[in-house]
UniProtKB/Swiss-Prot annotation:
Glycans are attached at residues 24, 38, 54, 97, 181, 301, 499. Pfam families: Hemagglutinin. One of its GO terms (molecular function) is host cell surface receptor binding. Keywords: Clathrin- and caveolin-independent endocytosis of virus by host, Clathrin-mediated endocytosis of virus by host, Disulfide bond, Fusion of virus membrane with host endosomal membrane, Fusion of virus membrane with host membrane, Glycoprotein, Hemagglutinin, Host cell membrane, Host membrane, Host-virus interaction, Lipoprotein, Membrane, Palmitate, Signal, Transmembrane, Transmembrane helix, Viral attachment to host cell, Viral envelope protein, Viral penetration into host cytoplasm, Virion, Virus endocytosis by host, Virus entry into host cell. Disulfide bonds join 30-482, 68-293, 80-92, 113-155, 297-321, 489-493. It is found in: Virion membrane; Host apical cell membrane. This is Hemagglutinin. It comes from Influenza A virus (strain A/Northern Territory/60/1968 H3N2) (Influenza A virus (strain NT60)). The record marks 345-346 as: Cleavage. A lipid is attached at residues 555, 562, 565 (S-palmitoyl cysteine). GO terms for cellular component: host cell plasma membrane; membrane; viral envelope; virion membrane. Residues 1-16 form the signal peptide. GO terms for biological process: clathrin-dependent endocytosis of virus by host cell; fusion of virus membrane with host endosome membrane; fusion of virus membrane with host plasma membrane; viral budding from plasma membrane; virion attachment to host cell.
């Protein structure tokens, strides 16, 4: 082979051909894309980890640590629960007739009145919370033959004995407690919420001393419902000096309906009604401080931005919030596949295109050109292909947010001990929903990432094919994203290729002439095949001569005998 190369060299000299090298009659043009030294790993449908030049985090994993009071109206419960504020606990009087979008209950909240229980506490709490108001209207109930406004030392209002301000404790008058039968129609066009109760004395003596009868009864009815409660007399654990209890009940009276109260003792009567409203108000348990700031989304941990489609802060939210998922991170590719530049090359130590690696330092575009010609080297971005890719990628984040952000709140689910199985079922359903959303989120992001990478690769290929169609036979595809241009191509010529105004006919003759020049040791010209065929033919000829000479020599020595038969 060395002999062949040497002969080729002599042959080229004899014909007066120019050897390839750093002449001024050719140029190199490479196409490439942006790259960064350290990219970001994302997940796609086909790859668990693929490096891209840029990515955006989609999961909000931290809160501000404070609850913003704008645009939602936040009502701080301070040391009162919503039910205590509803009943009119003396230390919660400041909440009378208040309104809210979100009522925040604190862990330090406590009751400071007569000990009570609410058999359907969660439902009442949720009902009042969603109404968003404690607006109370006093009504003129007529209670004949009984003593009103009972009080207790367990419920101090100032230095005096008191009671819940929204309830009326009825006891005997003298030595009688007549049967009470009171009606109250709803002539308005809204629902009315009535709160009432039943007193459970701790002893029979307390029962008769308050209500005369040994056993009382309370029945509250509307056309749609009826509740009858018989007091349970018996001692209970002491709370604020009392072993008796009050059970709190509630009744909703629709427009046109009638409230009927019938009792012969133990009645804790309503003083009026709460005006019910429909809305998206809610309640949340949180110890985060309330601050003057703006946030659409609130969690018990504090407010969070809603500029991301997912969050991992808390399942409980209020407002327009990202969807809760289990993942701590989900990254959306907002750049192309990253192939860091090989630093040993230098800028043009060995010029290479996008097939080998990306180009670092392209700050003015995602795709571009590098060239090497008689005037030196240079680089320029292709803004058209860059903008085409950016336009399609920019809307991705907004589309994902639109698909996932909830325009409603996820309230706390509470159940009584009796409803334990329902609570377990609810928890299972919620956990299943979270699992499904977490899976869907991961799949959605992987699909979008796959599309982004395919899209950016496609734009690179489009630019390469566009350049190839312009150059035609005037250049040769070097296989690494570069073209060897076989004519003198100055900077103006390079610019015409970049902007699509290159006229290949102008340079055709020069390119064809240079293209067929022998390229010396590179053996890349059209003579390479001829030289190889000639070398092969000469080798075969010499082999035949040697073989024929050996046969003739052997015949002369008598080692080989040939018989020819006719």
């Amino acid at each position: 082979m060395k002999t062949i190369i040497a002969l080729s060299y002599i042959f080229c000299l004899a014909l007066g051909q120019d050897l390839p090298g750093n002449d001024n009659n050719t140029a190199t043009l490479c196409l490439g894309h942006h790259a960064v030294p350290n990219g970001t790993l994302v997940k796609t449908i086909t790859d668990d980890q693929i490096e891209v030049t840029n990515a955006t985090e989609l999961v909000q994993s931290s809160s501000t640590g404070k609850i913003c009071n704008n645009p939602h109206r936040i009502l701080d419960g301070i040391d009162c629960t919503l039910i205590d504020a509803l009943l009119g606990d003396p230390h919660c009087d400041v909440f009378q007739n208040e309104t809210w979008d979100l009522f925040v209950e604190r862990s330090k909240a406590f009751s400071n009145c007569y000990p009570y229980d609410v058999p359907d506490y969660a439902s009442l709490r949720s009902l009042v919370a969603s109404s968003g108001t404690l607006e109370f209207i006093t009504e003129g109930f007529t209670w004949t033959g009984v003593t009103q406004n009972g009080g207790s030392n367990a419920c101090k209002r100032g230095p005096d004995s008191g009671f819940f301000s929204r309830l009326n404790w009825l006891t005997k008058s003298g030595s009688t407690y007549p049967v009470l039968n009171v009606t109250m129609p709803n002539n308005d066009n809204f629902d009315k919420l009535y709160i009432w109760g039943v007193h459970h004395p701790s002893t029979n003596q307390e029962q008769t001393s308050l209500y005369v009868q040994a056993s009382g009864r309370v029945t509250v009815s509307t056309r749609r419902s009826q509740q009858t409660i018989i007091p349970n007399i018996g001692s209970r654990p002491w709370v604020r000096g009392q072993s008796s209890r009050i059970s709190i009940y509630w009744t909703i009276v629709k427009p046109g309906d009638v409230l009927v109260i019938n009792s012969n003792g133990n009645l804790i009567a309503p003083r009026g009604y709460f005006k019910m409203r429909t809305g998206k108000s809610s309640i949340m348990r949180s110890d985060a401080p309330i601050d003057t700031c703006i946030s659409e989304c609130i969690t018990p941990n504090g407010s969070i931005p809603n500029d991301k489609p997912f969050q991992n802060v808390n399942k409980i939210t209020y407002g327009a919030c990202p969807k809760y998922v289990k993942q701590n991170t989900l990254k959306l590719a907002t750049g192309m596949r990253n192939v860091p530049e090989k630093q040993t090359r230098g800028l043009f130590g060995a010029i290479a295109g996008f097939i080998e690696n990306g180009w670092e330092g392209m700050i003015d575009g995602w795709y571009g050109f590098r060239h090497q010609n008689s005037e030196g080297t240079g680089q320029a971005a292709d803004l058209k292909s860059t903008q085409a890719a950016i336009d399609q990628i920019n809307g991705k984040l907004n589309r994902v947010i639109e698909k996932t952000n909830e325009k409603f709140h996820q309230i706390e689910k509470e159940f009584s001990e009796v409803e334990g199985r329902i609570q377990d079922l609810e928890k299972y359903v919620e956990d299943t929903k979270i699992d499904l959303w977490s899976y869907n989120a991961e799949l959605l992001v992987a699909l979008e990432n796959q599309h982004t990478i395919d899209l950016t690769d496609s734009e690179m290929n489009k630019l390469f094919e566009k350049t190839r169609r312009q150059l035609r036979e005037n250049a040769e595809d070097m296989g690494n994203g570069c073209f060897k241009i076989y004519h003198k191509c100055d900077n103006a010529c390079i610019e015409s290729i970049r902007n699509g105004t290159y006229d290949h006919d102008v340079y055709r003759d020069e390119a064809l002439n240079n293209r067929f020049q022998i390229k010396g040791v590179e053996l890349k010209s059209g003579y390479k095949d001829w030289i190889l065929w000639i070398s092969f033919a000469i080798s075969c000829f010499l082999l035949c001569v040697v073989l024929l000479g050996f046969i003739m020599w052997a015949c002369q020595r008598g080692n080989i005998r040939c018989n020819i038969c006719i």
